[in-house]
Design a protein with these regions (language model features):
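Tryptophan-anchored aromatic micro-motifs
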Residues: 38-77, 85-95, 124-142, 172-188, ...
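Beta-propeller fold detector
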Residues: 330-336, 375-380
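Beta-propeller blade termini
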Residues: 290-299, 338-349
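Acidic/hydrophobic-patterned starts of short beta strands in beta-sheet-rich repeat architectures
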Residues: 255-259, 299-311, 349-351
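Acidic, small-residue rich beta-repeat scaffolds with periodic aromatic anchors
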Residues: 168-262, 349-427
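Bacterial Sec-dependent N-terminal signal peptides
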Residues: 1-40
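Terminal domain-start segments
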Residues: 37-86, 230-294, 397-427
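Beta-propeller blade repeat segments, especially FG-GAP/WD-type strand-to-loop junctions
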Residues: 274-276, 315-332, 365-370
């Protein structure tokens, strides 16, 4: 049985949390529980080691600290499974403390698996444990190595391992937890160095948040200023902090740093865009309110970050796609008509959610190609329970070629099945 839930406004943290909590509760109530046969741990390890966990490990929405709470930035460039040893995953990445950027290489060694609580019959949940060591480049200033223990929650769906964020939005949610130390090559001194998704292990002296990670006031000066200021989304200072948080710092000298400044001219709200602090262009958003949120993600799957502006008072966004040919952002009118788009990366699709009536919600799936965005399928569902009312599939000419009333999960197209698992469940 399926439960559909959407984060329709990414800037509304409380809405996100509420929807994901409702989704989890409904799954627990409505799903058919799948228990595990009691399998010896070594047998379970053997079964699960055949999967590739590169994408589970390759999460870069990491928060970290070193020593007494100084902010630690970590980024993985590549993670891949060893061809000979299924326990080993080779890692390359970057670390940063203050302005000191280092490259590192290393390995994550998986050593055990355990089943996790099941909430849906269409996939299975597990936890893995591992050890890690990441060696920074010895020729770089202030370098050393990271070492410690690691844990991660994941799901198995259609014979593939995926990162488990079903409980994202719940108080205390965390995943991909790295807990250990950093040791200096030069002095041999060690410092606690922990990082993870959602929360940081052993961070009680730093994190005082309940619903989400929140830095205690007396440690915010330790590199957390922009992180905390970015919570003030409607202020100029908050927007400046958000631009800082969105930086691709791991690219070093090759980074393209996008920032912006708002202004109003003749009643029109505009954003001046800067690339590496040099003026690039002005985006005219029209006669709207001045409360907005910027989202720098890839909306047309071409490898470039785009510039989307959420308009608070209209609950809509305007999307400006990066044009390599023109060297600037270009308005994409397709998104103007959407109510609540979600980026479905795995399929190069955009899925939009809109209310048909009080009792019906429609999900529209558009596939992105060089020719633009094309509607390929729709779902009608009840807004407050798991009932799917209708599915339609469309051909290239926009004709409906398949229609199913009250479809079951197995009757959904493979793309809808995957979307349900990866996105409706918080992936």
């Amino acid at each position: 049985m399926l439960v559909f839930s959407f984060d329709v406004q990414p800037y509304k943290t409380s809405v996100m949390a509420m929807k994901k909590m409702m989704m989890t509760m409904l799954l627990l109530v409505c799903s058919v529980y799948l228990g595990f046969a009691k399998v010896p741990n070594n047998k379970l390890n053997e079964q699960l080691l055949r999967y590739d966990y590169s994408q589970v490990l390759m999460r870069n929405d990491l928060l970290g600290y070193i020593g007494n709470g100084q902010r630690l930035y970590m980024h993985f460039d590549t993670i891949y499974k060893d061809k000979a040893n299924p326990h080993w995953y080779h890692v390359e990445g970057k670390s940063k403390v203050k302005q000191n950027l280092c490259s590192f290489t290393g390995r994550i060694d998986l050593h055990s698996f355990a089943p996790n609580e099941q909430v849906d019959p269409n996939f299975k949940r597990y936890k893995l444990k591992a050890q890690y060591r990441f060696d920074e480049d010895k020729t770089q200033k202030g370098s050393g190595f990271f070492a410690g223990s690691f844990s991660s929650y994941f799901i198995i769906y259609q014979d593939t391992a995926y990162f488990d964020s079903i409980e994202d939005g719940a108080d205390g949610y965390n995943n991909n937890q790295f807990e250990g130390h950093w040791t200096s090559y030069r002095t041999k001194a060690s410092k606690k160095a922990n990082f993870g998704v959602g929360r940081i292990p052993d961070s009680n002296d730093l994190d005082v948040g309940s619903a989400e990670f929140y830095v205690t006031p007396n440690k915010q000066h330790l590199g957390w200023e922009s992180y905390m200021k970015a919570f003030e989304t409607v202020t100029p200072e908050g927007q400046k902090a958000q631009a800082e948080e969105d930086r691709e710092w791991w690219k070093g000298d090759k980074e393209i740093y996008i920032s912006w400044q708002s202004k109003t001219e003749h009643g029109a709200f505009k954003l001046d865009i800067y690339s590496n602090k040099h003026y690039l262009q002005t985006l005219d958003l029209g006669k709207i309110g001045s409360e907005y949120w910027v989202d720098q993600r890839d909306y047309n799957f071409d490898g470039h970050r785009d510039f989307a502006v959420w308009l608070y008072n209209l609950t809509k966004r305007q999307v400006f796609l990066w044009s390599e040919k023109q060297g600037k952002y270009v308005h994409e009118p397709f998104f103007d008509k959407l109510e609540s788009p979600t980026i479905f990366d795995e399929a190069h699709c955009i899925v939009d959610t809109h209310d048909v009536s009080n009792d019906v919600v429609e999900e529209r799936m558009y596939r992105c190609s060089t020719r633009g965005y094309r509607l390929i399928s729709t779902l009608l569902r009840h807004p407050s329970n798991s009932k799917i009312l209708q599915m339609k599939v469309y051909d290239d000419a926009g004709r409906c070629v398949r229609e199913v009333q009250n479809p079951t999960y197995k009757q959904l197209t493979p793309l809808w099945q995957k979307y349900v698992i990866l996105y409706f469940l918080g992936y």
